[in-house]
Structures are given as structure tokens and as C-alpha cells.
């Protein structure tokens, strides 16, 4: 019997959990200990033969400094509701209506006429400065002479007087008598100097800490609460809380044009990932990345000068770090740790370049919202592990861990036992993968407005949470996260600069609703984009469109690539033209699908052009179709919510679109609940059951040889590939 593997696991602890931590570390084979928000590392455990992670907050947990420097408290751009001028005379607009006053406070320290903006939303034009005043006592902007029945909003800066992450933890754990932590802005001069010196002192005061776990750096993702302390606005990628007059003045000097609040407010959409980014926002994002990276490096260098590793938490105050951007790799971070909600968020961590190792913090977090009487943490743990495992087998994190209050988890012994099994399984698969890339058939490109910088992040609003408008599209990335393809995220700007970039791919996918960032909107009216995609397909490439791909009403078509896809959408303009292609056909793509396929929200009013083949329709709404264009092929699918069956359907669609059907049955399972991955570096391959029930399947190895296999629930079996 081989010796049991240990290490690659981090466990949380607290001052009253010393012996319990030692026992759990022994059972789980942990080699690292961590503290969390609301817990402390016991001195006794600092002497254990394990890495000690110390959570470090650069932006909070120092209210004395924040209160002494109110001008350098973190700020956020907010926009009021729309208000209509219903009568002649002045219009008063309340700033804080539907906002939580314990979290936010309007910034009147800096010149409001310079940094606030009143916009006529009927015309889209900002009001001249003498057209409005501010009533500070009532926190209302007064528009002196508004146009009758025009709509108006106010964009304003507000101080974040209660850190939103601390607020969330405070509410979730029902903390009592805990001071609200204020968020201060490390980018500003006084605070920057203070934080740098404070970190240097901390290094000397904490010689036993091995890893500084920055949580995180400087700017919180956009998270705003309403008057009932409920979430009002969230964007995990949002930049709206990365602003201050100091930062914006620097930005103006760099770009050479005057800043407008509208560049951040974006009509109230705040440049979320579903928006096609404006030039001004791209400029701001680029500026923030570079400046954040510069300051990150200062703090990271301090860690290294004191023989400590620097680790970044992927979340909270992470805005501007952009791990897939151009500047992150120059910071010198040793590691990134992030929360794992599914396969997509796993790849969001494990694919990060420029660090020595990555770590996934798995769910559930040891908080009372799950660990309570009647709670079922083991169920959440199983779903989390099995869902993420598909992605781990393609691109693993180097470590796994858990967070929260260990004492809560100890009340669930079956949970403790299951996590022990997870840790053992993770170490074995990591060892068998050999630290090298698994076998991939070819490259799949995902084409959208954001490209590489939002790798694995499109269709995400709040972290790993499905929305009605996104789940039918997020399923594409979730499926891809565990498939044997190299996946590259390509932006329309990349294509404009280098049209042949698509030729590196076997298949290109465009997925999303019309006019959104993922689909592309007006980018499809750019002849360089449309011509490049058409050339790619005509010369033998494959194109898969999901939802409303290439949608932008232009020159008589709603789908710019209608002739490539073989479908278009009827929006009422072409109803006078009859449509006669309505017959369904059997096809290679749907051979493993049930008669009824789950397209999620689906799509209305899609019709097939002459020559296209319909694979599924709902009445006279085409849900799936295929088409030939030149030497290449295209597939249209209305939506792909994640499921094992849909993942197989997409898998077959990719091979068909690439014209490589004959290659599909290499490292392949006939049962779509079971998947196969091969690792050339170690000559090992695994067969994994993604379900909670036993499965039977036919397995095809790399030479196309087939054999039958039975697997237990959640099973993962490892074999050595013999080529003779």
C-alpha cells in the first residue's frame, strides 16, 4: 500500500480551537493554517510545522486612521433614481433615497460642482453648473428650472463609511457590539504612506507568519446596500468604488481629456460586464490596472524583504488587480487564493498566470448560515467539490482550503469525514497530473467585448450566482471549464488589430444577448470584425453562436452573421418575407440528447434561412440549427444551461463545427455523466463519475480502443495508458 499523501490543504483556526485544529490538520493532512475575518491565530499554533497564513487588510480595521482622515476614506460613484419634472418650478432630487445611510455618506468635502453631475436623461446632456444647487441639510439636489416632463438623475461621490464586506459578515453572523469598519483609500498620499509604514511594522511584530494573505488590496468591487440593509447593487467586477478626486485628477493628466462622472456611472449601468465598454471606461480601467499594480508591488516587495510570501485573495478589494491583464504578472505575487463556486470560478483562479501557486477556498464557508441545526453542509460540500472537480482535472489549483469558524464545522462529524476524503482525492489527482497540461484536442476561442481580461468571467454578476438572464449562457463556460480543449478568450479589439488571430482556433464561440458585452453589439457593424469571422469560417473554421450571436440590426439583418449561422431573428421588419424552412433533422450533434432539450430561456422568433438544417424548434421558434458556410460549419443554439446532457451536446457541436467528428472518440465516454482526461506527462488517465449514482459506460482511449467500465457514485479511477 502506497504512503498516504499529505499537504496542499489549508484549514481555519481560532484562539479557542488549538487542540481541535491540530486534530483536523492531522486528519485532513493540512500543511497550512489561516485566520479569518472575526478569528485570530493562537500563538501556540504559530510554532506548528505548518505554513501560517495571516489575513491582512490594507483598507480597513483601522478606524482611528479613517476617522482622523475623512478626506481619504474610500469613495464610490452613485446615481439617484430617475425623477421627472412633473410641474413648472424647481425639482428636488434626494440623493440617499433607497440607500443605506450607515454605509454611505455624500462627499461634500471635495468640490461637488467639479465631481458631481446632473444629467437630463431625456436628452442625455449634463446640466450646466449654475442650473442646480445642493441642499446639504436635506441631502437634496435642486434643479432650478427643469424642462417640463424631462427625466433627471444626479451622479455623486459618496464616502464608504461601512466596509461592505465587513457589513455582510456582521449581518450574516449577527455580530453584536462590533464597531463598523470604515474603508480608507490606500491610493491617496497620506494613507498610502501610513499603510506602507504600518505593513513594515507589522512584519517585525509578526515573525511567525509565513504568508501574508492580502484581503485584498485597494478597491472594493461595487457593492451597495439599500435602506433595509439588503443588497441593492452588486458587480463583482465593478470599478465604481475605485474613485476619488485625487485618482481622477491623475487620470485626467494621463489621458488628456476632462473626466465626467458619466464615464463611471454609464447611465446607471456602471460599466458592468454585460455592457460593451466605452473608450473612456477602457482608458480608466487601463489606468487603474497600472497604478494598482505599481502600489501592489511596493507591498509585495515589503513581504519579500521580510522573507514572507505574498498571497492575494481574489475578491473583496481586488478591483484594478486584473490577474488576466498586462500588469499583474509584474507585481511578483507568490499566490492567489479565491472562492470556488463552480467549475468556471475554479478556472478563474487556476488559469491565473504569473504566480507560483493558486489556491481554491472551497464551500461551504464555516458560517452559521449553513452550519446550524437542520443545516446540510455535507450536501453543499459534495455539490461544490464534484462541480469544481471537472475543472480541476483540466487546470488544477495547487492547493485547496476552507474558511470560517472551525468550531461550527466540528458539530458535523460526517462533514469532517467527507472533507478528509476530498483532501485525499485532491492530492492524488494533483500528483497524477504531474503539474503538466492535460491532453487537448484543439483550441476553442470565446469571442466577446472583453477578451482575456474577463477570462471565465463573462455572464457573472455576483460571484458564482445564476441569474434568469445569464444561466442559459453561463452554461457554455461551465461546460468548457471541464472539457479537453484549450480555451482562449478573444476580444473584438484583438480581432480588429489582428484579424487572423481566429485562425489559431478550431472553433470560435459567441454567446449572449443582443447588444451586451458578451455578444458584442455595435462591434458587429465593424467590417474588420464581421469579415474576419466570415473568412475564418469560410476557410474551414467552426463557429457556434448561442443566444443572440452577432446581433446588431444593420443593413437588413439582425444577426450580422445570419448567412454564416443559417438563422436570423424576426424583429418585425421582415415579416412580409415568407419563411418556408421549418423541417427538423436528426444530426450528429443531438445523438446523445433526449427528445426534449433544455435550452433554458430559449429564444423567440428565430427562423432558418434556406440551406440551413433545423435540429430543434419550438413551434416556429428555431432553437438549434446547423449550416455550411464555404468550407466551414456553424451551429446556432438558443441557450445552453449547464447540465451533463447539455455539456455533451455542446461537446459534439464543437467537434462537428470543427469538422473533426472522427476525432471525438478519443479519451471519450459513451455515458455523458462520465468524463475522461489524459495526462501525457505521467501517462495516466482518469475516468470520473460526475453524479451521485453508480454509472456504466464505454470508454475510448487515445487509440480509439473501447472497453466497458462501472463506477461508483462520484468515483474517480486512475489508470496508466499503455500504447502497445
Swiss-Prot record:
Active site: which residues? Answer: 316
Please give the InterPro entries that the UniProt record associates with this protein: Class_I_gatase-like (IPR029062), Glyco_hydro_b (IPR013780), Ig-like_fold (IPR013783), Lact_bio_phlase-like_N (IPR035080), Lacto-N-biose_phosphorylase (IPR012711), LBP_C (IPR035356), LBP_M (IPR035363)
Keywords on this record? Carbohydrate metabolism, Glycosyltransferase, Transferase
Protein function:
Reversibly phosphorolyzes beta-D-galactopyranosyl-(1->3)-N-acetyl-D-glucosamine to form alpha-D-galactopyranose 1-phosphate and acetyl-D-glucosamine. Active towards galacto-N-biose and lacto-N-biose. Does not phosphorolyze galacto-N-tetraose or lacto-N-tetraose. In the reverse reaction has activity toward N-acetyl-D-glucosamine and N-acetyl-D-galactosamine, but not L-rhamnose, D-glucose or D-galactose.
Q: Which GO terms describe its biological process?
A: carbohydrate metabolic process
Question: What is any Pfam family matched here?
Answer: LBP_M
Q: Which residues form the signal peptide?
A: none
Catalyzes what? beta-D-galactosyl-(1->3)-N-acetyl-D-glucosamine + phosphate = alpha-D-galactose 1-phosphate + N-acetyl-D-glucosamine
Query: Is the keyword Glycosyltransferase assigned to this protein?
Result: yes
Q: Show the GO MF annotations.
A: 1,3-beta-galactosyl-N-acetylhexosamine phosphorylase activity; 1,4-alpha-oligoglucan phosphorylase activity
The family assignment reads:
Belongs to the glycoside hydrolase 112 family.
Origin superkingdom: Bacteria
Q: What is this protein called?
A: 1,3-beta-galactosyl-N-acetylhexosamine phosphorylase Cphy3030
* Enzyme Commission numbers on file: 2.4.1.211
